[in-house]
Swiss-Prot record:
Its EC number is 2.4.1.212. The lineage of its organism: Bacteria, Bacillati, Bacillota, Bacilli, Lactobacillales. This is Hyaluronan synthase. Keywords: Capsule biogenesis/degradation, Cell membrane, Glycosyltransferase, Membrane, Transferase, Transmembrane, Transmembrane helix, Virulence. GO terms for molecular function: hyaluronan synthase activity.
């Protein structure tokens, strides 16, 4: 990023944080909300500060035998075809490209892929298409490919994702460091322009990668290598394949959280990193119902895998620390809001209520300050995501925790977004 743009982002962040500190200390002081505000501000400064120091890996990638694995279930036909075409267009050669249909009831997509592969023989010689007779879940679809490949590196791609031509080449630059066992790229919403929800989702994605994963990458411990675009060394996948397929939680089979599960396997071996120059666009839910189902799945995966991460406190304290921070921030927010509503409601006046809403808005702007350069107009929508986060996603997160044993994970029966 040019020095002028980075300076503008840093100065804007300092300005917003200064206002946030003033509002928090002046109006809420040492109350529960005030204490939460201090911890939140500290956490924001740490994450944003680390993200400002982040630099992508450079150099020419080594020679690897790479296999791409694309699981699909009831996917839109054109979307899956575009995914395949984007993988075929990679500047770094792929030895194999596996497309595994996981027992879809709608076979339009896999039929279109088979027709394309049979027609475009010259460019599809390394494409292997497989139809499973029974729907067993994303993990088993991926495992079918993993078991049949002798690749050094596995590239995982979701079936609704367009990866940029140099995405794989950029990701592999991180593997020049032999201590890196998994890497993920930068993700944005392909259908960002569809409606307000997709715009807000794109803002969130940009923060999740450009800030959160950038900060975690600086410590060598990103918590989730995202399904749309990630690479893993063979040593991460093959020795853990049976564990991956048959993972259980509280005595029940696990059918989600595959990305974080694989990332945890990589963390056991070494570093997990983010490569900002490896980019992809993916379809995101544009209806609130589908969006909330997706978030419910992610929340349950977050809590389940967080337990595993915290257990690493002796072997990998940084991973445990990042996880503890996320869990504590969630719990403190619930306590602070509860205290505000039930203990301090009588003391609330219009000025404090306005200040509280202002804090929500400013926190949202702080979190997404990187987006100011990318999409200035959309950046101003950040406070709307702050409201969505506080009044919808946080209660949903609490619901997900309370129903974590429920095996109805919210998977859609039609077009499934595997995340």
């Amino acid at each position: 990023m040019p020095i002028f743009k980075k300076t503008l982002i840093v100065l804007s962040f300092i300005f917003l944080i200064s206002i946030l500190i003033y509002l928090n200390m002046y109006l809420f002081g040492t109350s529960t909300v005030g204490i939460y505000g201090v911890i939140l501000i500290t956490y924001l400064v740490i994450k944003l500060g680390l993200s400002f120091l982040y630099e992508p890996f450079k150099g020419k990638p080594h020679d690897y035998k790479v296999a791409a694995v694309i699981p699909s279930y009831n996917e839109d036909a054109e979307s899956l075809l575009e995914t395949l075409k984007s993988v075929l267009a990679q500047t770094y050669p792929l030895s194999e490209i596996y497309i595994v249909d996981d027992g879809s009831s709608n076979t339009d997509a896999i039929q279109l892929i088979e027709e394309y592969v049979n027609r475009e023989v010259d460019i599809c010689r390394n494409v292997i298409v497989h139809r499973s007779l029974v729907n067993k879940g994303k993990r088993h679809a991926q495992a079918w490919a993993f078991e049949r490949s002798d690749a050094d590196v596995f590239l995982t791609v979701d079936s609704d994702t367009y990866i940029y031509p140099n995405a794989l080449e950029e990701l592999l630059k991180s593997f020049n460091d032999e201590t890196v066992y998994a890497a993920t790229g930068h993700l944005n919403a392909r259908n960002r322009q569809t409606n307000l929800l997709t715009r807000l989702t794109d803002i969130r994605y940009d923060n999740a990668f450009g800030v959160e994963r950038a900060a975690q990458s600086l410590t060598g411990n990103i918590l989730v290598c995202s399904g749309p675009l990630s690479i893993y060394r063979r040593e991460v996948i093959i020795p853990n394949l049976e564990r991956y397929k048959n993972q259980t939680f509280l005595g029940l089979p696990v059918s989600i959280g595959d990305d974080r599960c694989l990332t945890n396997y990589a963390i056991d071996l070494g570093r997990t990193v983010y490569q900002s120059t490896a980019r992809c666009d993916t379809d995101v839910p544009f209806q609130l119902k589908s969006y909330l189902k997706q978030q419910n799945r992610w929340n349950k995966s977050f809590f389940k895998e967080s337990i595993i991460s915290v257990k690493k406190i002796l072997s990998n304290p940084i991973v445990a620390l990042w996880t503890i921070f996320e869990v504590v921030m969630f719990m403190m927010l619930i306590v602070a809001i509860g205290n505000l509503l039930f203990n301090q409601a009588i003391q609330l006046d219009l000025i404090k209520l306005f200040a509280f809403l202002s804090i929500i808005f400013i926190v949202a702007l702080c979190r997404n300050v990187h987006y100011m350069i990318k999409h200035p107009a959309s950046f101003l929508l950040s406070p709307l995501y702050g409201i969505l986060h506080l009044f919808v996603l946080q209660p949903l997160k609490l619901y997900s925790l309370c129903t974590i044993k429920n095996t109805e994970w919210g998977t859609r029966k039609k077009v499934t977004i595997f995340k």
